[in-house]
């Protein structure tokens, strides 16, 4: 009885959703064109990451080398997107990472992916709402923060924010109501905000390079000493000066934080299907966002010494630093519009994902309720908006930004892993008889005097199948070999990332760290070759990731390595969230 219950439970965990059960819009009507989806992705990316994270990372973590941070984070995002495009091509009727996971990998895998993407959107909404209030408060002389610190202090340092930001809560609820009124109306507002953002951003980049000074990339401790004699407000740490004032370890940590800036493509992949190929939309928005981040971070650090950058309002205060006072207000308006469009870009796809998961029974069924002829998921919008608003009310931006990076990196790593495994799996229509035949082939035949040689024959057949597959197309046996090797590779890459993240100086200084890394690389190469030797599926796809299995494994390694830069507190919060989901 117990065995049967356990077996049924296990079958539910690996149960796959039939592709024929997917509706064209997966339960909700789509009113967004391809251009609107590009606006959604660009507007979501060019938000808090551009106007808040850039200043904080440049001032405290990387200095002018923040451009390298965005290069590393952008590379990781590019590899993840390429893997997602193939993942999406396997389920042509849906563009949601959650639905694709449900169809191809099973219920448990889909829930983990979907639950972490929901966390990503919740935190992104809370962070952006806080960032909007920071920018607005800075524009009016910090009047709001000073008033809230006096009236609603929280008195829980290291856990909660200094004060409860009731204005951030109100902003999230207001936008939730706007979304509940209908997607076309909110999309129109979204285009206006994003257009203003792009215009102001272009002005900021051009002005920054005009007023920039290359000396700010070659600062010394003497420059810092002279600055402290003139300015009385809080300065950032000077480091060693130069283009990379802090160690390489800090640059990598900055790259992990900067990944926050590239999580917006989940907004596109969760929203819906359009005529334009998903690959074009996703990669075009990534290119635009990377160029914007690279240009803004370069212009900012050229205009202002990195240790003088304002933490919460870096771009408007940069114009004040160079004597362009009126331009500060123009840029501030653009910042507010950008953050507003980013908020809408987070809340819209979050409600769609919640509604879809509720329809599948993985969340409360009430959240799947839609209203009106437009089928707007009002319950999902208002419940997620309320939860995100509470997070914005209680937590500081810096406390939860890294948590969002962990959630997105894990979700994208799972997509890359899925692409690696699925490429080597047999057709889903493989008969049970063929599977049983392959299992029988793996079992050695027992015949009297040959009993003693049975283990050797079995091991020999298994080893031979690792290097010399018996079929030119994937079989059940070759698929199982790839799955096992892929899990082993993830374990080895995790150990390697941990060593490189925790003891980088010991690794490059000699033994025993260097020896350990060399052995790990040898094992990783060997297992990777085993996967490479297995037959790939000939099924036609609109896009196939090149250089398999190398590219997905590099993507997984970069994502894991960036995750290893996070603090123990971030991992504790992440664990609590996943325990709640279970």
PLM feature segments, named:
Residues 1-582:
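Alpha-helical transmembrane bundle of multi-pass secondary transport proteins
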């Amino acid at each position: 009885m117990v065995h049967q219950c356990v077996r049924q439970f296990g079958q539910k965990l690996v149960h796959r959703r039939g592709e024929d059960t997917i509706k064209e819009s997966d339960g909700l009507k789509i009113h967004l064109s391809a251009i609107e989806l590009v606006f959604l992705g660009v507007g979501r990316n060019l938000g808090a990451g551009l106007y808040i994270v850039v200043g904080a990372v440049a001032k405290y973590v990387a200095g002018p080398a923040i451009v390298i941070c965005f290069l590393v984070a952008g590379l990781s995002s590019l590899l993840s997107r390429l893997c997602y495009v193939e993942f999406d091509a396997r389920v042509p009727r849906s563009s949601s990472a959650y639905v694709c996971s449900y169809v191809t990998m099973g219920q448990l895998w889909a829930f983990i992916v979907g639950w972490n993407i929901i966390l990503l959107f919740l935190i992104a909404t809370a962070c952006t709402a806080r960032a909007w209030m920071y920018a607005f408060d800075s524009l009016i002389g910090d009047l709001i923060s000073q008033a809230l610190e006096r009236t609603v202090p929280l008195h829980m340092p290291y856990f909660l924010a200094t004060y409860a930001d009731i204005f951030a809560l109100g902003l999230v609820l207001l936008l939730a109501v706007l979304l509940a009124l209908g997607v076309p109306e909110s999309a129109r507002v979204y285009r206006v905000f994003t257009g203003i953002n792009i215009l102001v951003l272009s002005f900021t980049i051009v002005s920054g390079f005009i007023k920039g000074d290359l000396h700010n990339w070659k600062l010394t401790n003497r420059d810092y000493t002279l600055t402290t004699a003139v300015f009385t407000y809080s300065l950032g740490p000077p480091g060693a000066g130069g283009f990379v004032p802090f160690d390489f370890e800090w640059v990598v940590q900055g790259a992990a934080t900067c990944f926050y800036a590239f999580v917006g493509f989940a907004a596109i992949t969760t929203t819906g299907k359009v005529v334009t190929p998903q690959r074009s939309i996703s990669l075009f928005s990534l290119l635009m966002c990377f160029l914007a981040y690279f240009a803004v971070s370069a212009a900012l650090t050229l205009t202002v010494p990195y240790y003088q950058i304002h933490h919460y309002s870096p771009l408007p205060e940069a114009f004040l630093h160079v004597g362009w006072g009126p331009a500060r207000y123009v840029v501030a308006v653009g910042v507010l519009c950008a953050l507003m469009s980013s908020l809408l870009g987070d809340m819209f796809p979050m409600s769609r994902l919640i509604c879809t998961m509720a329809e599948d029974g993985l969340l409360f069924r009430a959240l799947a309720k839609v209203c009106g002829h437009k089928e707007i998921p009002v319950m999902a919008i208002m419940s997620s908006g309320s939860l995100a608003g509470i997070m914005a009310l209680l937590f500081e931006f810096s406390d939860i930004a890294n948590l969002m990076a962990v959630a997105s990196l894990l979700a994208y790593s799972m997509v890359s892993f899925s692409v690696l495994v699925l490429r080597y799996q047999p057709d889903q229509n493989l008969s049970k008889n063929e599977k049983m035949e392959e299992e029988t082939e793996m079992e050695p035949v027992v015949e009297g005097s040959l009993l003693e040689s049975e283990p050797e024959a079995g091991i020999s057949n298994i080893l031979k199948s690792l290097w010399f597959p018996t079929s030119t197309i994937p079989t059940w046996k070759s698929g199982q070999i790839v799955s096992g090797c892929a899990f082993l590779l993830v374990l080895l890459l995790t150990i390697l990332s941990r060593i490189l993240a925790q003891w980088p100086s010991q690794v490059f200084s000699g033994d025993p760290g260097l020896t350990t890394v060399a052995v790990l690389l040898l094992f990783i190469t060997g297992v990777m070759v085993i996967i490479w030797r297995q037959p790939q599926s000939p099924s036609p796809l609109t896009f196939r990731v090149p250089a398999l299995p190398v590219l997905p494994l590099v993507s997984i390694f970069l994502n894991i390595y960036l995750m290893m830069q996070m603090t123990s507190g971030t991992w504790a919060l992440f664990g609590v969230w996943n325990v709640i989901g279970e």
